[in-house]
């Protein structure tokens, strides 16, 4: 009997313990469930729902409006995002509450941070568990009366330097022009009129900025002006109520001549921010939009730093800190004076020009015309600029120096070099050509190749280059043959992707990389067909005449790529003199196509070219582009190519010829 009673007592005790355990587990689960709800709305930064889950005494301690304001202000200031909360244990304090330790990670303006030693206390009220809140649920170290502060450490963007180490782009100061409304009120209409005239902006724009302001003691920003624009600044400083302050800004040197090459920075867009969301950008960041500023964005941009800290009286308690990391400088091979000279010679005509040093491969100039002054994007657009840009209809942003074009007769150097190397061309031997038209045979149907001049005699290489005889070079190309021509062109980099620090369109020998059709091969020989080259490709090809047949690896970023090395052995050294003689005749001989490009004291080899853009041979409405390329061959310093678009009935290749002559004379004699 006693034994049975003992067994019964043991059974009942076990049941009681189990019930207690289940009840305890159930309570802890309820608390964790409640905290998980709080955690989820916290991660979403749903501060209203967070406040709704506070205990009664917590709501007495802090009102809803203050709660929302504190979290919004703090999280906004630190740029909190991508939050995560992990429970790391539990501690039962009494029968009605449970403390849940947790850690938090988030992305902030100082990078990703981890906050440890959080503890949330949950208490039961009306059959539900509530959060017992205090300041330590903002940051674990935080106490009442503490303030959260943020210091920004701004990184400096790397500078862009020219070959001499002078600035083409740098972080500097501009002058911010603003109006102090209360001091501007007297004779306001006259002041607005005067200010608009000085700045070349509309009076209505100034009026709109003033109308949007509600506090007469608040400065109203109008525009920013370059600090060396002394005429504007002096005239503005005499107007009462105008305030001029320094403002950090990107600043460019070189004006329109460097616009398409250097590019510009401006505020990041929402789309750009999304596309670069893991790179440390914020909604206040500047980002490269074009040119070198865009190509080298990752190198130039700095990484901003900062510190998040708690201010407790005189004490500063650091939460997280990251030092700013300045961007890297870039040194270019560009000669800014040469760049400016080329641009001024082009006089706004649509086209492009590239100059290289034949001995080193350094790119001395890369010009696109028309262009823009990058400073417009960090200051403002005057009415004059707006009118000019409306007429250009976006043409100023078309970066032409990295476009590819039909090279026209400038291709004849490539054809001649291949012919000499292949042994199918004897420079002294005359070719019998009669008339101004030619076709290989009747299989060409009605298609004929034409030339401008019939000298009435057999012509050799020198004559053919000097007179720019298309028939001669078409026949040389046919004698070379498809495979040899394609392979020979590759010795000049044609049809290959060029290794260069600036994105360029790739040259091509034809659309399908073959020259299997006779007419296409023949046309390619004198620069028509489907062959395409950039101004850089053309300048490099002719640089071989000044460097014993070698083409150097083109270099733009000399700070990173400082070693000169051969890229292509384009022409056999023993063949160079014959080519120099032939292509110098274009300039040195009185009847050469570029006789007016001679520079006293220097031997210059070069070639004019006109490339036709038309549907077929009968099309007379097509446009023409004019080329000229030149290289000084003795102690060679420069090879320069230039293309001017749409020169038909306007002077043809004589337009770039005159421009390049002036540039060569300037550069060689300076």
Residue ranges: model-predicted function:
Residues 104-106, 265, 545-546, 643-646:
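Short beta-strand segments enriched in hydrophobic/aromatic residues
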Residues 3-28:
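Sec-dependent N-terminal signal peptides of Gram-positive bacterial secreted proteins and lipoproteins
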Residues 27, 33, 37, 48-99:
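Short solvent-exposed beta->alpha transition segments
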Residues 353-358:
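Short hydrophobic alpha-helical segments used for membrane anchoring or interfacial signaling
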Residues 311-319, 359-409, 414-644, 652:
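Beta-lactam-recognizing serine transpeptidase/beta-lactamase-like catalytic domain environment
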Residues 81-352, 372-396, 404:
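Extracytoplasmic/periplasmic proteins that interact with beta-lactams or build/remodel peptidoglycan
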Residues 33-40, 44, 48-52, 65, ...:
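Solvent-exposed, polar/charged alpha-helical surfaces in well-ordered, non-transmembrane soluble domains
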Residues 36-39, 53-58, 106-109, 146-151, ...:
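Second-shell loop/turn segments in exported
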């Amino acid at each position: 009997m006693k034994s049975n009673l003992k067994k019964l007592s043991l059974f009942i005790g076990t049941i009681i313990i189990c019930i207690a355990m289940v009840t305890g587990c159930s309570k802890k689960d309820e608390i964790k469930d409640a905290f998980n709800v709080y955690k989820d709305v916290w991660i979403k930064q749903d501060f209203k729902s967070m406040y709704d889950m506070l205990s009664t005494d917590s709501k007495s301690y802090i009102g809803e409006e203050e709660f929302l304001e504190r979290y919004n202000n703090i999280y906004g200031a630190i740029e909190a995002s991508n939050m995560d909360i992990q429970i790391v244990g539990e501690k039962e304090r009494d029968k009605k509450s449970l403390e849940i330790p947790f850690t938090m990670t988030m992305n902030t303006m100082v990078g990703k941070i981890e906050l440890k030693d959080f503890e949330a206390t949950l208490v039961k009220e009306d059959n539900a568990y509530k959060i017992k809140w205090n300041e330590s649920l903002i940051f674990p170290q935080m106490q009442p009366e503490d303030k959260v502060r943020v210091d920004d450490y701004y990184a400096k963007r790397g500078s862009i330097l020219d070959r001499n180490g002078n600035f083409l782009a740098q972080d500097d100061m501009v002058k911010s022009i603003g109006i102090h409304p209360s001091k501007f009120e007297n004779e306001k209409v006259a002041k607005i009129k005067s200010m608009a005239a000085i700045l070349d902006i509309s009076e209505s724009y100034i009026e709109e900025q003033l109308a949007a302001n509600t506090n007469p003691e608040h400065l109203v920003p109008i525009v920013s002006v370059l600090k060396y624009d002394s005429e504007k600044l002096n005239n503005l400083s005499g107007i009462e109520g105008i305030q001029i302050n320094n403002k950090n800004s990107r600043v460019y040197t070189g004006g329109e001549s460097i616009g398409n090459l250097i590019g510009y920075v401006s505020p990041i867009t929402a789309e750009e921010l999304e596309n670069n969301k893991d790179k440390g950008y914020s909604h206040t960041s500047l980002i490269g939009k074009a040119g070198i500023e865009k190509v080298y964005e990752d190198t130039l941009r700095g990484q901003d730093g900062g510190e998040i800290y708690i201010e407790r009286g005189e004490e500063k308690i650091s939460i997280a800190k990251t030092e700013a990391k300045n961007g890297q400088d870039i040194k270019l091979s560009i000669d800014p004076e040469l760049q400016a000279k080329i641009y001024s010679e082009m006089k706004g005509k649509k086209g492009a020009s590239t100059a290289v040093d034949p001995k080193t491969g350094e790119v001395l100039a890369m010009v696109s015309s028309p262009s823009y002054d990058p400073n417009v994007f960090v200051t403002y657009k005057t009415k004059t600029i707006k009118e000019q840009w409306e007429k250009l209809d976006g043409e100023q942003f078309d970066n032409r120096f990295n476009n590819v074009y039909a090279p026209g007769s400038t291709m004849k150097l490539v054809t001649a070099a291949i012919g000499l190397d292949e042994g199918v061309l004897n420079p002294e031997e005359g070719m019998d050509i009669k008339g101004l038209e030619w076709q290989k045979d009747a299989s060409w149907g009605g298609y004929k190749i034409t030339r401008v001049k019939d000298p009435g005699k057999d012509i050799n290489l020198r004559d053919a280059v000097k007179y720019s005889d298309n028939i001669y070079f078409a026949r040389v190309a046919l004698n070379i043959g498809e495979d040899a021509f394609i392979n020979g062109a590759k010795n000049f980099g044609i049809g290959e992707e060029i290794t260069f620090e600036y994105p360029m369109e790739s040259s091509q020998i034809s659309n399908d990389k073959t020259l299997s059709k006779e007419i296409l091969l023949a046309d390619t020989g004198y620069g028509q067909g489907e062959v395409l080259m950039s101004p850089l490709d053309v300048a490099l090809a002719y640089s071989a005449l000044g460097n014993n047949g070698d083409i150097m690896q083109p270099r733009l970023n000399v700070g990173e790529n400082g070693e000169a090395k051969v890229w292509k052995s384009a022409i056999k050294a023993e063949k160079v003199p014959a080519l120099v003689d032939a292509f110098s005749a274009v300039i040195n001989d009185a009847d050469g196509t570029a006789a007016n490009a001679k520079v006293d004291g220097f031997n210059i080899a070069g070639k004019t070219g006109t490339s036709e853009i038309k549907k077929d041979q009968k099309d007379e409405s097509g446009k023409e582009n004019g080329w000229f390329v030149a290289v000084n061959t003795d102690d060679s310093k420069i090879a320069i190519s230039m293309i001017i678009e749409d020169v038909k009935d306007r002077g043809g290749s004589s337009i770039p010829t005159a421009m390049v002559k002036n540039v060569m004379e300037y550069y060689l004699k300076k």
